[in-house]
Curated annotation (Swiss-Prot):
A GO-annotated cellular component: cytosol
Binding-site positions, NADPH: S14, W15, R35, K117, A151, R266, I290, E292
PANTHER family: GLYCEROL-3-PHOSPHATE DEHYDROGENASE (PTHR11728), GLYCEROL-3-PHOSPHATE DEHYDROGENASE [NAD(+)] 2, CHLOROPLASTIC (PTHR11728:SF1)
Name of the featured protein: Glycerol-3-phosphate dehydrogenase [NAD(P)+]
Length: 355
């Protein structure tokens, strides 16, 4: 086991809670920072996150804390000042103001590990790029943890494999030891861009896969969407400097397969319900956890257009979310695209008939 660390997990959703449990199981001192005082009190008393992970026992060594208004107040500020590692488990679209609050509280060598999966809609930036904006001097101490990992299965200690990417290879190897247990295997990588993009775009493709399932199509259709979705994700990754090989790994193909086929996938559930005819507004209003793929679809579609990268499945999901076309029409549009060589790596968009 690695030396015990003082770790703060920001965000008490299902994944933040599961990561906190994982690290506490590994013998580390873990604080879980929430916004809800009621939930923090419940976790400390009952060792259960009854809102986001009901029915699962949380390691009793985890201590939940909260600030009334922001992370800068009272106990959270105290624990952050002593943290050697801070885990960012806040939804991507809400992360930037959290980073701004964090900066003055952290020690010089504090390590930031991101678990959020998305691209900021307003700026089209990844989390690493947000770190560069808000705390550039810390980017050498930044890593991202991603891969096929449902929180519920991590809580049950079912064998899981993920990847941790850090541009500092030595630091990445150090972190993979901290995040590994006999049932949770962590691989290391230096391709931060590729790992972040794989984690973000798979949620878009998962919505498409859910739409297909909701329409009553078969496994053939779902796997076709997954495979071609991986192809367009790889094209975007190459345009942004990522290694194409990363997308065949855990944060690419692995996470894509899990999210497109798993019953626990929130993004697939969004697509499934869209395919069955529900309105997007009604779907989102009924969910108590965020499906990152909705906002990510808008960001990825805009980014692809800006970079002139052909991403027809992403475009189709965007148009369904916008109500431009029906789910069934979107599938038909994809099937009626110009026939081509499978290995063709387009630099020019070839689907231009939908705005």
């Amino acid at each position: 086991m690695s030396n015990p660390q003082s770790i703060v997990v920001l965000g008490g959703g299902s994944w933040g809670t599961a990561v906190a449990h994982l690290l506490a199981t590994g013998g580390h001192k873990v604080h879980l920072v929430l916004r809800s005082q009621k939930l923090a009190d419940y976790i400390n008393m009952h060792h259960e996150n009854n809102i986001y992970l009901p029915g699962f026992s949380i390691h009793p060594a985890i201590h939940a804390v909260t600030g009334k208004i922001s992370f800068l107040t009272k106990e959270p500020a105290h624990v952050l000042a002593k943290a050697t590692i801070v885990i960012l488990s806040v939804p991507c679209q809400s992360l930037r103001p959290v980073l701004q609050e964090l900066e003055p509280l952290l020690t010089k060598n504090c390590i930031l590990v991101n678990t959020a999966k998305g691209i900021e809609v307003e700026t089209l930036k990844t989390v690493e790029q947000m770190i560069l904006d808000e705390m550039a001097h810390r980017v050498s101490h930044y890593a991202v943890l991603s891969g096929p990992s449902f929180a519920e299965e991590v809580m049950c200690e079912k064998p899981t494999a993920v990847v941790l990417a850090c541009r500092n290879e030595q630091l990445g190897e150090h972190l993979r030891e901290i995040f590994s247990t006999p049932w949770f295997r962590t691989y290391s990588s230096t391709d931060v861009t590729g790992v972040e993009l794989g984690g973000a775009t798979k949620n878009v493709i998962a919505i498409a896969a859910g739409v297909s399932d909701g329409l009553g199509f078969g496994i053939n259709t779902r796997v076709a969407l997954m495979t071609r979705g991986l192809a367009e994700t790889t094209r975007l990754g190459k345009a942004l400097g990522a290694s194409p090989l990363t997308f065949s790994g855990l944060s690419g193909l692995g996470d894509l397969f899990l999210t497109c086929s798993g019953e626990l996938s929130r993004n697939r559930q969004v697509g499934l319900r869209l395919g069955k005819g529900e309105l997007l507004k009604n779907i989102t209003n009924s969910m108590n956890m965020i499906a990152e793929g909705i906002k990510t679809t808008y960001a990825v579609n805009t980014l692809a257009s800006k970079l002139n990268v052909d991403m027809p499945i992403t475009k189709a999901v965007y148009n369904v979310l916008e109500g431009v076309i029906s789910p069934h029409e979107a599938v038909q549009k994809l099937l009626c695209r110009q026939l081509r060589n499978e290995s063709l790596d387009e630099t020019q968009p070839i689907w231009t008939d939908i705005p």
